[in-house]
Swiss-Prot record:
Quaternary assembly: Monomer and homodimer. Part of the essential Sec protein translocation apparatus which comprises SecA, SecYEG and auxiliary proteins SecDF. Other proteins may also be involved.
Name under which the protein is recorded: Protein translocase subunit SecA
One GO CC term on file: plasma membrane
The encoding gene: secA
Subcellular location per the Swiss-Prot or TrEMBL entry: Cell membrane; Cytoplasm
Annotated organism of origin: Dehalococcoides mccartyi (strain ATCC BAA-2100 / JCM 16839 / KCTC 5957 / BAV1)
Amino acid sequence: MFKFFSSFGDSNEKEIRALEPLVDKINQLENSFTTLSDEALKAKTIEFRARLKDTFETTTAGIQEDITSTTAELAEAQKIADNSKQSRLKAKLESLNKDLSAKETTALNGILPEAFAAVREASRRTIGLRHYDVQLIGGMVLHHGKIAEMRTGEGKTLVATLPLYLNSLLGKGVHLVTVNDYLARRDAYWMGPVYHALGVSVSSIYPMQTPTEELPSRLFDPDYTSEIPGDPWTHFRPISRQEAYKADITYGTSTEFGFDYLRDNLRPDLAQCVQRDMNYAIVDEIDNLLIDEARTPLIISAPDTEAGKLYDVFARLSPRLVAVKDYEINEKDRNAELTEDGWANVEKLLSREGVMKGNSLYDPQNAPLIRHLRNALSAKEFYKKDHQYVVKEGEIIIIDEFTGRMMLGRRYSEGLHQAIEAKEHVKVQQESKTYATVTIQNLFRMYRKLCGMTGTAATEAEEFSKIYKLEVVIIPTNKPAVREDYGDQIYKDQSAKFKAVVNEIDEMRKLGRPVLVGTVSIENSEMLSNMLKRQGIEHKVLNAKQHEKEAQVVAEAGKPGAVTVATNMAGRGVDILLGGKEPTKDDAKVYNEWQAHHQQVLEAGGLHVIGTERHESRRIDNQLRGRSGRQGDPGSSRFYVALDDDIMRRFGSERIQGIMEWAGMDENTPIENGLVSRTLENAQKRVEGYHFDVRKHLVEYDDVVNKHREVIYAERRKILSGADLKSNILDMIREEIITQTAEHTRGYDSSEWNLDGLVTHLNGIFTLPAEINAEALAKLSQEEITDLLTRTAEELYQKKEDETGAGSMRLLERIIMLHTLDSLWVEHLTIMENLRREIGLQAFAQRDPLIAYKNEGHVRFQELLETIKHDVVHNIYRIGIQIQHQTESATAKAASSPVQQQKPLPAAPAAAIPGVSAKAATQSTTPAAKEIGRNDPCPCGSGKKYKKCCGK
């Protein structure tokens, strides 16, 4: 790993040097662009696009055709599970896409100096900001699909305009992914005049701000003026989500881009889809998204089953279990395992509650109880109020551990959220059923070109390289950094540590320096606030409970003597300016007062940052330090640590405790030396390594479902795009007839054939003419039977089409295919979730759980594909056009209606059609019969189990 960082440093220097000649070229062009009129500057975009078009027509036409044909071949290979062909075609497709990207990059590189010069000039004219040379380098790094590490205050928002404009010239749409919905609007609106001056459209997508909004989207339009009094987004014109994606540049949050992708793959009509292909994305604060958020999947779900009384039972039971005696806590892995005494105690308590079946918790009937028990213990030991969540208006709202923000609409999965609700005695919500899901990792790996910006990526360079194939380039600062980072001070306990923190806050405040204090939880921020109040120290608190005041608090945090206590949210994306927010020069008195404050803070030493606890990740610590010393300003930082801090307790306190006892330190005397700091850093590295393994593990497991998703979503697109479904369905019918004929005509002697069973089975699909019966079929050979039945099926299909009309039949084919695909895909996701939950037991059998999951997942996916064919064949003749129209309208309604969310803003899937499932529709046209068990003999007489024959 150390070799990795050594070579990383060398390559970074070479990368920067290689870009300097381009910076010189852009600077040489500056004067010529300054002399252009506004109309001539805007016309440059038309010129650039024309030049790119001429280049592409001669260099990429053949590649595009090959990509289209290879994609179609791959889809067919995936359907028939031809693994060797899939591997070959995937490699070919990857190579073709690389060739296309290389051609596009070469063409864009040819106009890069002029395009960057145009953006620099447009920015200077419209918003008064001229890109520094280092910002030009940052823009080039982003254009080349890499991560630009830029320190806080170096102007990442402005840097992004360069590659966004350049790549938008291809006309394929580009995305800027922000960390929150405020920045999705602010950055698009702030940079809007720059893009408008160049004739490029820019939009913003963000989550609902009010219950009446539906997929809110805005387009920057100087000719539009909002009628809302005091609207900060005066020139943001409301548009549809589809229009937002048609804009040249789209700003938005990762969740909105992700849920739009999932929603598009639930829609019943291609015309309702909103996204274009995923072309180029810049991810702001990329470490936050691809590292911190990577373990969190995006899920569209709907209410499924009632929560039941078990959550309340275990909420009453868990406080009666005692740590160590009844269960052992593993702090590192964050799980609790019952001891032998614990098992006995739990069995006794559950028996009293009357919920345990049999005499042992190990009985398979009690498997659900074990899941409830684990969730209840996790809720008790690892999920604390005002740390991991808050209780607000009778709801449990998750707190993002990395940003400190409330994650409205998000819920823990697999029953954990319900366990926490039961613990806090709020209403336990229904469990949910997953209809569509994708991890953040796989979502962003879909982009043809991905890059990002952050102030802290170097510590995770190895992970970015291994998982995302992204290189990190550290961009030099415009001015030398002068912030002083003091060594950590370690105390024996929390009480002594926070007393020292209050003393340092008071000292810095009296010097006229603003102080930012970072805490890891809401509880700690409020506890420190109470200590400051008792000392009479005026301060502001910024945590998830006061997130509405965030922009205002951060704007004032740089004033002389200002004290701000904040959780990790600390205004990421908003700079803390020394002296406070810089006013306009319209009011000379106000501006002069700000200048005096600004100078006063500079002379006092700038912003002082205090960290009250080391985070599990060094990046989060560095982000807090990075609030100070922006753009060459003075500043300082220091971390205070106690031996009973979470990270110390879990990963390193014993060694440091020994050092302190050896040194004879009392609780009020801190220790500060290199050995302690190194021990702390090593503890953080171990935690980072652990989380890296977890994320890598997540990718490997999700890749299994991702392959399934690619096949199903590609097939769905094909259905929506008007593919010839009739020939596909007739092929399925022929395949079913061939399979069933072979099954029922085994043996050399026709007397051994089960022709009654064959006729019964086929009559379950369509009604055979009276003359085609077992007696008539007995006179034919196996081949003749197949030909006769196939011909009859085709004639009956044509008869149905003649009766309903060709147009209606095509619509019916589409609806049945869509509904079957959607409903069975939902079932498959549930099967895969359950499989993943249980697969860990394979380790006890000395089998690799991942390999077992891949193998079992492959078997289940083949079963899914076969079941899709089976259900389509068994429904196409039976479902009438009236029911089909109901299905169409219900599908459209379901795809656009919001439902209970596991993540923000899901919509109900096309499959969720109340009362009009394929099964229900079929039953409405056939007589009721006694229900057949899946393991019962099939009534067709084949001798096989029902689930393996007609019950497939």
